[in-house]
Amino acid sequence: MDPWRRKVSGIIAQVALLLLVSSGTVVADMCDSVMVTHLPPSSFRSSSQLSNSHSPGFAKLNRRDGAGGWSPVSSDRYQWLELDLGDRTRITSVATQGRYGSSDWLTAYLLMFSDTGHNWRQYRQEDSIGMFSGNTNADSVVQHKLQQTVIARYLRIIPQDWNNNGRIGLRIEAYGCPYSQYCKV
């Protein structure tokens, strides 16, 4: 290929990439990194914990540490699990599991988000209030891609329903990318 055609081909490729990025296609594909897996235990808070081995720091997806996930003292709708992602983050999906090797899992939950950790907003889907279906057992993963991405530093899961033969039990992962990365694209 002569130098002129090579240059034209390079320009066409750059224009095509620019069009993909501006349409959001590349951003969506690039913004699905795990955001919870590498967080320290201090990034997790909860309304309560059943014991030290059921503490919120054990609520990471696919982990078996402690008692295999987070469980609060009481199983009621006043419980919550909170994640501090460290910085503003673009969240594109959320995945849950029950507490490993148990009868404890959520069957429905609400997702809240915040930049401050004090003022919370409830995630809402276009066609519903934003209640997410949870799990049907302790170990399968249920992942929900968010119809509208969330930009926030903090996430809070509020259990709404759980297995009738168990209690609230949760392991979680959020997928996305740093907000600063999203803004640069």
Report each predicted region and the residues it spans.
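Predominantly extracellular/luminal regions of secreted and cell-surface proteins
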Residues: 27-64
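Aromatic, loop-rich ligand-recognition surfaces of beta-strand-rich domains
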Residues: 2-30, 64-123, 146-185
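A short, polar/proline- and glycine-enriched secondary-structure boundary/capping micro-motif
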Residues: 57, 107, 133-135, 168
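Short clusters of hydrophobic/aromatic residues that line enzyme substrate/ligand-binding pockets
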Residues: 59, 70-71, 132
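Polar, glycosylation-prone regions of secreted, cell-surface, and some intracellular proteins
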Residues: 46-48, 67, 114, 131, ...
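Extracellular carbohydrate recognition and processing domains
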Residues: 121-145
